[in-house]
Swiss-Prot record:
Entry protein name: Histone PARylation factor 1
Lineage: Eukaryota, Metazoa, Chordata, Craniata, Vertebrata
Record organism: Danio rerio
InterPro entries: HPF1
Recorded phenotype for the gene knockout or disruption: Morpholino knockdown of the protein causes malformation anbd delayed hatching.
Basic residues bias: start-end ranges: 1-10
């Protein structure tokens, strides 16, 4: 095994806020005159403790135009998509719930890291879903991510707003579709999405300028592929690499998860224990990104054998990075990490 890990030189000094975030934060403060009133906006943010971007409310308006009776089902027949998560609050579904749900767990799939907030449910068989991805809990999302939880932990980036994400999904569906009977409906929806996004001034690229700027600040991709951003100063303080590559770390995880007995498992855990020691050194020297990376990777691997280590690493990293809400979300998720029971508002 390599030494204590080395700092990774960065071509550009980093700050806590990614490029473009200040501009987006200002945009989030203005009133774009959607049908969603201020009281309802505040309700969403109070229950989730997260600020919602304008495109969230604009997309609700768009879906109301498609299906006034049930905007959440506006994309169901054409795309097999349903608006969930914070959209349940706009539809007042939470008012009918007899229990007090934990919205940190509402539509939180097995592999969703704390940075991910589900907003759209897709194919239930693969547990396909889309959500906002935030680098900071008190900032606006940096992109829309897509995951299929039954297939693994990979997060695919689909633009920086819901219109772009749904359009990209639609265009992919059109390419894969063999039957032609619904093409007219898909074409009509495609044109409607493009027209409304243009009217609102929203970009429709899969990778926007702000997303490319963020990529320059990503210190490591992590297992899920979306990457993590931490502040790195001009002296490269903030992040140091793990002493294992992703491939070798996955082999270590596999050996632990598939060990035939406790003795073999304890032996296989030795490299992880050594890395935890390196993380402690890194934290002492303000390289908080190292523990963040290891914690996210072990969370992504998903084995219950890592839950204790993840609890040891990630809340500490989030606190050191002043991202405490993500630590709260993680704790709630690990206490109730399930492949099922995703809808916290479902009748029990």
């Amino acid at each position: 095994m390599a030494g204590r890990g080395k700092r990774k030189p960065r071509s550009l000094p980093q700050t806590e806020t990614p490029n473009g975030e200040v501009k987006k934060a200002k945009e989030g403060l203005k009133d774009d005159k959607t049908s969603v009133g201020e009281e309802m906006r505040e309700e969403v943010e109070r229950l989730y403790k997260l600020r919602m971007p304008d495109d969230f409310f604009q997309f609700w308006d768009f879906c109301e135009g498609l299906n006034a009776d049930c905007p959440q089902d506006a994309l169901k027949n054409t795309l097999g998509l349903q608006l969930v998560g914070p959209f349940d609050i706009l539809s007042k579904k939470h008012k009918n719930s007899s229990s007090q749900p934990n919205f940190h767990l509402h539509w939180r799939y097995f592999y969703d890291p704390p940075e991910f907030q589900t907003i759209i449910q897709g194919n239930a068989d693969t547990q396909h879903h889309m959500g906002y991805f935030r680098d900071l809990p008190d900032a606006l999302p940096v992109f829309i991510g897509e995951n299929e939880a039954k297939k693994g932990y990979t997060i695919t980036q689909l633009g920086d707003n819901i219109f772009a994400a749904v359009l990209l999904f639609l265009q992919k569906k059109k390419k894969e579709k063999r039957q032609q009977k619904d093409d007219a409906a898909l074409n009509r929806l495609e044109e409607d999405l493009k027209r409304e996004a243009e009217r609102l001034g929203l970009p429709l690229e899969q990778k926007t300028k702000s997303m490319k700027q963020r990529e320059r600040k990503v210190v490591t991709k992590t297992f899920h592929g979306a990457g993590i951003v931490v502040p790195v100063d001009k002296n490269d303080v903030g992040y140091r690499e793990l002493p294992e590559s992703d491939a070798s770390l996955k082999k270590i995880c596999k050996a632990i998860a598939e060990a035939k007995d406790d003795e073999e498992r304890m032996k296989a855990f030795a490299p992880i224990q050594e890395m935890i020691t390196f993380v402690q050194f890194a934290n002492d020297e303000c390289d908080y990104g190292m523990g963040y990376e290891l914690g996210i990777d072990l969370f992504c691997y998903g084995s219950h054998y890592f839950f204790k280590v993840v609890r040891q690493l990630l809340p500490m990293a989030y606190n050191l990075l002043k991202r405490g809400l993500f630590g709260e979300i993680l704790e709630a998720h690990l206490a109730s990490r399930s492949q099922d029971n995703l809808d916290q508002l479902a009748a029990v």
